[in-house]
């Protein structure tokens, strides 16, 4: 299935291929043995799912059916249903109101900062562990990773572009061929600055290579992070798949403030906090985040009056589970 889609759409990102495969796997699970991709079989089993989940499944199915040379007549009903969900999504986003599904986890940017203050004492302990001769376990590494990612995302909320990002230098980066650059994102360390070099991201076909300067406060944290974790040039800084990266953020925020905040929600929070009442500087942020101002205003900016309060919450359950690390993550070629 994956290979068929990859051959049909060779220029699509690995993460997009993975999303197609996950949606089709979910559909196959609902259909049972010997799944039949016909409207009378597919539409009833997905009807109870949220409309955006239905849309994603249908979109993946349409791609697969086209890739396997099915006639337009077999695909027509799926396209019509998918397009209806797309229209619903667009109307919901343009309303300026956060969706009912997202609303419980929609908090202010200050609430995210408060969460990071709760985590900081644990991070201070983790930073001292290597000097004390204590090896960081996966829970330590995951928490430090989540903390560092959150600190960056509240200054420039990218998508999941940190997933499998490689640490490099200016000299090493300049030696890469265009093809080598095209398939990866890099964290470029220089003497007085760190830049993110984005080549493999959702809208790369429109915006090309993007250079994102790192905020100075976050830069200091990032240098400390790579030092404590022992990373060097050529290493993957955040060895998580795209899905695992956002799940790491969601599980961390759930543990500390009982909210599920992933990368998409962070984009809503950041832009709603900044532009919900003012559109100043929106063009600069749209360029940085790799989308148009129209997408920014229509999709991400929400009414800040919908921000939800957070609880004084810290679950007394075991540490965050171990996440998939680099050896289990999709290979980038």
Cite the ranges covered by each PLM segment.
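C-terminal secondary-structure termini that scaffold catalytic or DNA-interacting sites
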Residues: 309-333
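Basic, Lys/Arg- and aromatic-enriched nucleic-acid-binding interface segment
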Residues: 114-161
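Active-site/catalytic core of tyrosine-dependent DNA strand-transfer enzymes
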Residues: 207-270, 275
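Conserved tyrosine-mediated DNA breakage-rejoining catalytic core shared by Y-recombinases
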Residues: 165-216
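Catalytic-site neighborhood detector that most strongly recognizes the C-terminal catalytic loop/helix
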Residues: 276, 287-317
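A short, glycine-centered helix-capping/turn motif at helix boundaries
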Residues: 142-146, 151-181, 277-280, 289-291
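Non-catalytic DNA-binding core/recognition domains of DNA-processing enzymes
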Residues: 2-86, 214, 248, 264-268
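C-terminal catalytic core of tyrosine-transesterase DNA break-rejoin enzymes
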Residues: 265-292
